[in-house]
């Protein structure tokens, strides 16, 4: 099998993957559940449910999985999921951790692939086992001990990729919250290079910093962030793969905001004129709605039909004196809530 285009870039476009499928020059891995895979998958894809890898993610186990899937050291690999890239990111990282060089994320989910009208199949390819060595890549992994040692270093940035309320409730001291949903753009699992660079710049994160990402437990959401950073050429990125669950179980220090609630999320709202570029579409927002001005009764009625959250409604709107940081309004005046 030949190497993929742009081997240093961890993302492959759906257009290029289609060409590689026709050439039969690539190993494609679908990390959805088996029953989902059986109902239809990208042509020539083999199945690796993420749970199988997470059940034992030791280097030896990852090596065996790779070999059983017909992956040798030289095999070009593309991985996809139907979960905004988080599950596939974790598998890409695992292969890179044992030293596999040519492995990439597909830039769309399976659903997006289908929406593009691209070919799918229910045929299961035959797999010829291969031989794969293990050459651990320690530079891409952070442990709890390492994180505790470097978290006070000014050249180290820790990013928490959980949803903001989880972050507010408790997080690793000094961590900056970049929720995983802010990493995507319309029709793709990740922002454009320019969009990602703008996000980092506006959060005050220098591109020459050492960046460590973490999430809740197994490194899926933070794995997506890891590759978002690598996709724009950030050289020194590590994944704290066992993430906050391990950190808390080890009784490491944590920071938290007492009595955190949904109003504390206001700092994550974006100006409506920018919303298509920086956030998911409004129908996907589950806990509120951003408006350019105080909502009319008609607008409230529309929202009640659109964005329920446990039977309660929250709207945030801008006044003239709202400060904007990274397109995020910091609410200074009114906050409306409707039951």
Predicted regions, residues:
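A short, acidic, amphipathic alpha-helical segment used as a generic capping/interface helix at domain edges
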Residues: 192-205
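His/Asp/Glu-enriched short active-site or ligand-binding loop at hydrolase and phosphoryl-transfer sites
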Residues: 179-185
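Extended hydrophobic/aromatic segments used for targeting, binding, or gating
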Residues: 194-195, 236-241, 245-264
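Thiolate-centered catalytic microenvironments shared by cysteine-dependent enzyme domains
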Residues: 2-8, 53-145, 210, 215-245
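Short loop/helix-cap segments at secondary-structure boundaries that form the rim of catalytic
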Residues: 37-43, 167-173
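Extended interaction-bearing regions that mediate binding to partners or small molecules
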Residues: 288-339
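Short hydrophobic beta-strand that contains or immediately precedes a catalytic carboxylate
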Residues: 17, 25-32, 48, 155-162
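Active-site neighborhoods of enzymes that stabilize oxyanions during catalysis
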Residues: 2-13, 111-169, 176, 251-287, ...
């Amino acid at each position: 099998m030949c190497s993929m285009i742009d081997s240093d870039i961890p993302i492959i476009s759906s257009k290029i993957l289609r060409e590689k499928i026709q050439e039969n020059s690539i190993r494609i891995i679908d990390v959805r559940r088996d029953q989902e895979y059986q109902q239809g998958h990208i042509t020539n894809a083999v199945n690796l449910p993420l749970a199988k890898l997470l059940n034992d993610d030791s280097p030896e186990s990852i090596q065996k999985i790779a070999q059983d899937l017909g992956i040798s050291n030289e095999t070009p690999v593309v991985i996809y999921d139907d979960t905004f890239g988080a599950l596939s990111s974790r598998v890409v990282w695992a292969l890179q951790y044992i030293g596999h060089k040519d492995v990439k994320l597909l830039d769309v989910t399976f659903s997006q692939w289908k929406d593009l009208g691209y070919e799918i199949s229910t045929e299961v390819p035959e797999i010829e086992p291969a031989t794969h060595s293990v050459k651990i890549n320690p530079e891409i992994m952070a442990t709890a001990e390492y994180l505790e040692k470097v978290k006070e270093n000014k050249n180290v940035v820790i990013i928490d990729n959980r949803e903001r309320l989880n972050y507010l409730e408790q997080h690793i001291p000094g961590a900056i919250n970049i929720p995983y949903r802010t990493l995507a753009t319309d029709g793709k699992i990740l922002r454009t290079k320019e969009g990602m660079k703008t996000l980092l710049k506006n959060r005050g994160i220098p591109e020459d910093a050492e960046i460590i990402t973490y999430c809740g437990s197994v490194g899926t959401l933070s794995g997506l962030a890891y590759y978002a950073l690598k996709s724009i050429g950030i050289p020194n990125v590590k994944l704290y793969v066992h993430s906050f669950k391990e950190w808390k179980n080890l009784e490491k220090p944590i920071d938290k905001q007492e009595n955190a609630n949904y109003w504390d999320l206001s700092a994550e709202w974006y100006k409506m004129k920018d919303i298509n570029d920086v956030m998911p579409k409004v129908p996907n927002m589950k806990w509120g709605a951003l408006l350019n001005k105080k909502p009319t009764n008609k607008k409230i009625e529309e929202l009640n039909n659109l964005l329920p959250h446990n039977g309660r409604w929250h709207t945030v709107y801008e006044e003239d004196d709202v400060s904007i940081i990274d397109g995020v309004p910091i609410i200074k005046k009114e906050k409306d809530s409707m039951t």
